[in-house]
Amino acid sequence: EDCLGWFSRCSPKNDKCCPNYKCSSKDLWCKYKIW
């Protein structure tokens, strides 16, 4: 199953973003995790 890349729409309850990305609960797309 493919992970979701940057700016891909996602659901915070079911975060399928790629490693080092996190689903933004505000914008509802995958954002790069800097920390």
Curated annotation (Swiss-Prot):
**Locations listed in the record:** Secreted
Annotated site (Probable key residue for the interaction with Nav channels), which positions?
A: F7
Q: Which cysteines are joined by disulfide bonds?
A: C3-C18, C10-C23, C17-C30
SUPFAM superfamilies reported in the protein's UniProt record: omega toxin-like
Q: In which tissues is it expressed?
A: Expressed by the venom gland.
Would you say which domain of life the source belongs to?
Eukaryota
Keywords, sorted A to Z? Disulfide bond, Ion channel impairing toxin, Knottin, Neurotoxin, Secreted, Toxin, Voltage-gated sodium channel impairing toxin
A molecular function GO annotation:
ion channel inhibitor activity
**GO CC terms on record?**
extracellular region
Additional comments on file? NMR structure determination (PDB 5I1X) is done on a mutant of 36 residues with an additional Ser at first position and an Ala residue replacing the Phe-7. Functional information is not known on this mutant.
The free-text domain note is: The presence of a 'disulfide through disulfide knot' structurally defines this protein as a knottin.
Q: Which family does it belong to?
A: Belongs to the neurotoxin 10 (Hwtx-1) family.
Q: What job does this protein perform?
A: Gating-modifier toxin that both inhibits the peak current of human Nav1.1/SCN1A, rat Nav1.2/SCN2A, human Nav1.6/SCN8A, and human Nav1.7/SCN9A and concurrently inhibits fast inactivation of human Nav1.1 and rat Nav1.3/SCN3A. The relative rank order potency for Nav modulation is Nav1.3 (inactivation EC(50)=45 nM) > Nav1.7 > Nav1.2 > Nav1.1 (inactivation) > Nav1.1 > Nav1.6 > Nav1.3 (IC(50)=8 uM). The DII and DIV S3-S4 loops of Nav channel voltage sensors are important for the interaction of this toxin with Nav channels but cannot account for its unique subtype selectivity.
The name of this protein is Beta/delta-theraphotoxin-Pre1a
| Organism of origin | Psalmopoeus reduncus
